[in-house]
Amino acid sequence: VIEPRCADPAGTIGFFLCHGGQRLRGAAIEAPRLEARRLLAHVLNTSEEALLRDPRAPVPADQAQQFAALLARRVAHEPFAYLTGRVGFWTLDVEVSPATLIPRADSETLVEAALEACPDKGAALHVLDLGTGTGALLLAVLSELSAASGVGVDLKPEAAALAARNAARLGLAGRARFLAGDWAVALAGRFDLILCNPPYIESAAIAGLMPEVARHEPASALDGGADGLDAYRRIIADLPRLLAARGVAVLELGAGQQAAVEALGRAAGLTPEACRADLGGVPRALVLCAA
């Protein structure tokens, strides 16, 4: 297929937007023109609106090279957030890296469920985020609960370090600390609120995911074992010793997992209190309560 020529002269903003959009369209990227615009705005450290105001403005050679390099990575289906190193989550701008799962809008449902379960926004709650990754869940909750403090745990030291950087950049380092560890193995004490977005995809299903996910995001954050429930079994077994009296745990679910995870909770002596659906109508945030 011969791509149509670009109307703007080579080396200009308009040319790079046109050429980038064509390359991304050829790679079956879903919103090629939008992504080309966002990528060039990132490289030039400007707004998308500013790009469109002056499409014949020249792009400096070093930034043109940077754009070409990032474009090639996106054509290879590397996630957009890994190219820019940032993603929006809740009201926060969060740093991401290939060591972490990219926070999704679906996971904001956990924040909503947690805030609903903890209506006193001034309470000095102790919060735990298991498998914290970027720290997005914990930091989003702390940004809304002004007197709360928390701990985030991740198996990967580089993820825990990244989460700590996010806390510092967002002004939350005084109320959040991050540790490398195997789920809750090394933790003691009790928590009023526990958050967790565990790996919950069945092992056999991972190869069939979008290439951005299957090829690039960490398998340890995706693979939930043969039935997708391995992480839930480990986490829920620990919840009774970790939850304070009347404490709540909010767990992210995969599609179709609500009944199985509720059963695991009941078997551990916990009460399924609520399950909040995401914007697509999928039951996504399960709330389990301690006695």
Predicted regions and their residues:
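Conserved SAM/SAH cofactor-binding pocket of Class I
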Residues: 105, 109-208
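Residue-level signal for inorganic ion chemistry
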Residues: 39, 77, 107, 137, ...
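Conserved AdoMet
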Residues: 2, 33, 38-116
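Non-catalytic nucleic-acid substrate-recognition regions in nucleic-acid-modifying enzymes
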Residues: 1-35
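Conserved hydrophobic residues forming the short capping helix/wall of the S-adenosyl-L-methionine
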Residues: 24, 118, 167, 239, ...
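Mobile active-site "lid"/loop adjacent to the S-adenosyl-L-methionine
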Residues: 200-231
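Conserved Class I SAM-dependent methyltransferase catalytic core
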Residues: 226-289
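Short helix-capping segments at alpha-helix termini
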Residues: 28-29, 145-147, 168-173, 242-243, ...
